[in-house]
Design a protein with these regions (language model features):
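Membrane transport/envelope proteins' first extracytoplasmic loop
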Residues: 2-261
């Protein structure tokens, strides 16, 4: 019985070899494609995790409607499990490029101690061209293909508020000279995000020395977690490590709110 089935099978293949070969080729291509996708996904995760570690991407981003004071930052730094802390400012404003109104996200970067061994230098910039800001009134632009050639080194960007407030309420200067083009791990894709300013979509991101911001309160705080860099960003152990510190920081925040009252 078994030999008969085998003979019939080979007879069918021989009688319609073209159809058999086509089906075989389709299956082989599908299996090869699936195997390649399966292998490449793990490689991509490994590469991105290494990139995040190299440029010290934040593990936690803290936001507060009331802002952060120096006392708040001290309390965050003293929370068990916290490794690096960078208190910064961020604001969405407007500018004009050509004849178009453009929404600009302005982010603060450390003015001093940008060394790679400084754990508080979080979301480190990778310079593509030019240099980093060294004085007030200078900025670097996040490089993207869309604005390549439209905003370049040597250009001056004039900023204005997107609401009834004056720009001086947010920034000490309204003009910034572009001195460099950079990549940042904070934005892994070309999409920067949404905004309540302008058209609703952020078109361009610039970084200035954090001291260029006006106001007494930090708008956001980036935190790295002790031991998290040794773990794979996409694994459960990483999320467990970060979540433990997240809970502690929540308790720290509650205490700081009570202290302000």
């Amino acid at each position: 019985m078994g030999k008969t089935v085998i003979k019939d099978t080979f007879r069918e293949i021989k009688g319609s070899f073209g159809r058999f070969f086509a089906i075989f080729a389709i299956v082989a291509i599908g299996v090869s494609f699936f195997a390649g996708i399966t292998a490449s996904s793990s490689d991509m995760r490994y590469s991105s995790d290494s990139y995040y570690d190299e440029y010290n991407l934040f593990d936690l981003r803290l936001l507060s409607d009331a802002g952060f004071t120096d006392d708040d930052i001290k309390a965050i730094r003293e929370t068990d499990g916290v490794k690096g802390v960078f208190a910064a400012h961020e604001a969405d404003v407007l500018t004009t490029i050509g004849n178009a109104q453009v929404t600009v996200r302005v982010m603060g970067v450390p003015e001093k101690n940008r060394a790679d061994d400084n754990e508080d230098y979080i979301n480190r910039l990778r310079l593509k061209e030019g240099r980093l800001p060294e004085r007030d009134g200078e900025c670097v632009v996040r490089y993207s293909d869309f604005y390549d050639g439209k905003v370049d080194i040597g250009d001056t960007i004039t900023l204005r508020s997107g609401d009834e407030k004056d720009i001086s309420d947010t920034l000490k200067f309204n003009e910034y000279k572009v001195v460099g083009l950079v990549y940042t791990p904070y934005y892994a894709s070309y999409d920067i995000g949404q905004s309540s300013t302008g058209s609703g979509k952020v078109n361009i991101c610039i970084m200035v020395n954090d001291d260029c911001f006006a106001g007494d309160y930090y708008t956001e705080t980036f935190v790295t977690v002790d031991g998290a860099k040794q773990l794979n960003t996409y694994k459960d152990k990483y999320f467990s490590c970060v979540d433990d510190v997240k809970v502690r920081l929540g308790n720290t925040g509650t205490k700081q709110i009570e202290a302000r009252r």
